[in-house]
Amino acid sequence: MDMQNENERLMVFEHARKVAEATYVKNPLDAENLTRWAGALLELSQFQTEPKQMILEAILKLGEALVIDPKKHDALWLIGNAHLSFGFLSSDQTEASDNFEKASQFFQLAVEEQPESELYRKSLTLASKAPELHTGGTAGPSSNSAKTMKQKKTSEFKYDVFGWVILASYVVAWISFANSQTPVSRQ
């Protein structure tokens, strides 16, 4: 993406965050708003040099949403994404593993709530592969060229996974934002 598109995305999600924050003041029990807010925070975290704090804030908002509506599948999926992202950002293997496990649990709950969602099922599959991706994989042929090729494939797969997670988060946040901005018809 070029710089202008990045700046536009930043402005869109910052606006969504501010709208959600203002809505929260009026109605702190709106699970949909909390989910939108968390989605915006996750998107904004991509623009941060230290994204972990913003991801943690998103996890807290999603936790609030799930207290209000424990079966809210998009919040379950989004909190799974937040934990997955946090795990990949963690250099501590134990912390990363804990977050990958939480991600798997939330993705499983999302799948249970909406089993027809291909996105939720793929996210669950990805979460099961996350620990290996995080460590870069341990098994492989002994030759250097084969090892290099495997590392390259693993690295490419990581970027593919991150790309899909980011895209999926963007789509969910955009849909949530669009739904919140629909005009009310007056009849």
UniProtKB/Swiss-Prot annotation:
Post-translational modification: The N-terminus is blocked.
Source superkingdom: Eukaryota
Residues exposed to the Mitochondrial intermembrane side: 179-187
Keywords: Acetylation, Membrane, Mitochondrion, Mitochondrion outer membrane, Protein transport, TPR repeat, Transmembrane, Transmembrane helix, Transport
TPR repeats: 84-117
Locations listed in the record: Mitochondrion outer membrane
Motif (AKR2A-binding sequence (ABS) required for mitochondrion outer membrane targeting): 179-187
Pfam families given in the database record: TOM20_plant
Molecular function in Gene Ontology: protein-transporting ATPase activity
Transmembrane segments: 161-178
Induction and repression of expression: Up-regulated after antimycin A or rotenone treatments.
Signal peptide as annotated in the record: none
Leftover remarks: There are four genes (TOM20-1, TOM20-2, TOM20-3 and TOM20-4) which encode mitochondrial import receptor subunits TOM20.
Name assigned to this protein: Mitochondrial import receptor subunit TOM20-4
Organism of derivation: Arabidopsis thaliana (Mouse-ear cress)
